[in-house]
Amino acid sequence: MDLIETVNACVKLQKRVLGLAPNTNLNTAEQSVLNDYNALPSRVNGKTYALLNQIAVYTPYTINAPIISLAVRISTDDYDDMRSGIESILDVLAAAIRTEGSRPTRVIERRVLEQNVKQLVDDLRLKSLISDLSIANLAAVDTAMIQPEVIETENPLYADIIEQIVHRPNIGMNGGNIRATLGRWSGNKGVVTCMSGMDSEHRFTVELKTRTCGIINIVYIPTAGTILIPMPAGRNREGDLIDVSAEMMADDFAIDFMDDDKIIQTETGVGVYSFPMCNRIRFRINPWNTQKDDDNLGTVHMINWAQGTAPKQPAISFMFETRRTFTEGNYQHLSRCAPKAQYMMDTQFNDVSFTNRPAVDWNIQSLLTSNTQRVWCQKIAMLIAAFAAKI
């Protein structure tokens, strides 16, 4: 963890240095940036460390970070020296990440054990517990140093499918006397088709990974002309569908936001809804019923629907998408910072830059969620994420 904290601190210092401007008068806060920067070169300028380069070869890295004279006005040359100095330190830290990341570990370690990396951390003597990228903060959460961070998650839903088939005797050749609910969802989107070959409510639940709040958008989409119906027993059937979304009323489509088995909030009709903290979303849908059939709202292809012999069956399809969803961060959730960490992983920390690495797909999501050599995978992901917070 102390290498992560050192990277956090140096990244924050880099942002402060880049926040200055040459040939302008410095206020008190900006002069403190000079002092904080000079503290590093005074300890590490000219020192050399043997660490792994991008092809996993131990290479001598020498820090070139000149000390800047204190002044109320910083020159262009001094500014360039500061900028190149902090970049030199970050380059060495990148090599330290490759070196430390190559060492397997089974538990979260508070101190670095790799000798050359330990020497670098001790020389820099600069640490910060938190990073701007939430992935880098997970070790501090696991060790109870900080509370779990509230993040905007990109994948609140478990990947799942639904194939819910209910039927009565005398199944029709076109899906009559069958109620079929077919669909799938993952990440933050899902698509479901509900075919009503008989008067019966479609009811199913979408599980969230953890208690989450946010916004959900639900919209009807054109339904398929013909679908395969996977029967629980016997040969599969097919359903010839007719889209009846034009006759759907708000009460025909209900969404229950639930905390376990308790209903927290209910909305009716498609649209955009803000939902409270919940871990389940239950849909209750009735595309067609006897009342609509008696009111002659169907077409000629829906004659004898109640008897199960109609040429076509009423159906609707809809898509739902969760947006701006917030929850407590953990290893299962992908936040908006994950692509930035992945970019750094693909450029400076590719798989060949480690002398030893876990046997998983080389991407941030696989490292965070792997059950194989879990702590080692997570350590590498957090180290890369801490470095990825740099400008």
Swiss-Prot record:
Keywords: Capsid protein, Intermediate capsid protein, Virion
Main location: virion
GO molecular function, one term: structural molecule activity
Stretches assigned to coiled coil: none
A Gene Ontology term for the protein's cellular component: viral envelope
Listed GO biological process terms: fusion of virus membrane with host plasma membrane
Superkingdom in the source lineage: Viruses
InterPro entries for this protein: Rotavirus_A/C_VP6 (IPR001385)
Intracellular or extracellular location(s): Virion
Subunit structure: Homotrimer. Interacts with the inner capsid protein VP2. Interacts with the outer capsid glycoprotein VP7.
Task of the protein: Intermediate capsid protein that self assembles to form an icosahedral capsid with a T=13 symmetry, which consists of 230 trimers of VP6, with channels at each of its five-fold vertices. This capsid constitutes the middle concentric layer of the viral mature particle. The innermost VP2 capsid and the intermediate VP6 capsid remain intact following cell entry to protect the dsRNA from degradation and to prevent unfavorable antiviral responses in the host cell during all the replication cycle of the virus.
UniProt similarity note: Belongs to the rotavirus VP6 family.
Protein name: Intermediate capsid protein VP6
